[in-house]
Amino acid sequence: MAVCVASRRLTLLNVIQGLYRTELVSQHAGQSAINTLTVVSSNCWSSKRTFSTSQAYLNGVNEFISDVTTRNTADEDIISELTSTKPGSSSESKKNSKSTSEKSKDRKNKPKEAKKIGIKKSTLPPLNPEKKRRREQWQVQKEALQNKFQEGWHPRKKLPPDSLDTIRHLYATKPDVWTTPVLAEQFKVSPEAIRRILKSKWQPSEEERQRREERWAERYRKIYSHMEELGLRKPKGEWTAKVSDARRLGLEEKPLRQTVRKQPRSDEKQVNISRPDREPAPKGSTSVE
């Protein structure tokens, strides 16, 4: 396994030291050059005698500058090695890019896989199914009514035989006035029901008529007795029987009329009407004065 030498040498301490040295050298080199120039110029103006630095001093300065430059070049080489794009580094970058692309694809595919797993889990029966609660009686009745009347509660209106006869009679006498829509609106049924009634010739039998009359008579008695209990009607007697609708319709038989004999008036109770200013007429005379 190949190990990069530059990466071995690169540590945090070395990098900080290199940066610090470069800053110091740049400052020192600039200051030394400026100082030497200022010193030489000042000496030239102050005295006519020329002074020259010794060879040993110049050699020491040159060695110091060369050492600093070599250190700078070494640091620059390290940085260039790190930042340079070699074939190995390009291959590594390609691998890294491939790995990142694969990771992104995996991340994108994870939600789909999770959804599929969630769907599969939902299709599978639960391990601990919840116990079904016992439904209330009204809930059972409501469900039964909904199943029975899916379109809602719209009961059919059943017309009595009298209404059927009335519809046929009105249409037969005045068909222009009592049309099918008018009859449907009047009797609160559909026009189709009116058409069927007009086409049919159904009539109730005698037994059905008799049962219907008995039912209505019983209903009349119950209503009247209830109103008597509430005090809205007086007890039924002869004076109420005279104006009874049931008697007029023939539901009640008329009682036999009792004949009362008139008693003759007695002479004592006979009243004699006479005028005091006139004399009584003789018994034998029949003339009128």
Swiss-Prot record:
Q: Which keywords accompany this UniProt record?
A: Mitochondrion, Transit peptide
Q: Which residues form a coiled coil?
A: none
Which compartments does it reside in? Mitochondrion
What Pfam family does this protein match (any one)? Neugrin
Say which family it is in.
Answer: Belongs to the RRG9 family.
Q: Where is this region: Disordered?
A: 81-141, 250-289
High-level lineage: Eukaryota, Fungi, Dikarya, Ascomycota, Pezizomycotina
Q: Does the keyword Mitochondrion apply?
A: yes
Targeting signal (transit peptide) range: 1-58
Xref: PANTHER family: NEUGRIN (PTHR13475:SF3)
What's its job?
Answer: Required for respiratory activity and maintenance and expression of the mitochondrial genome.
GO cellular component: a single term: nucleus
Q: Which domain of life is it from?
A: Eukaryota
Which InterPro entries is this protein grouped with? NGRN/Rrg9
Q: What name appears for this protein in its UniProt entry? A: Required for respiratory growth protein 9, mitochondrial
Composition skew (Basic and acidic residues), residue ranges: 92-116, 264-281
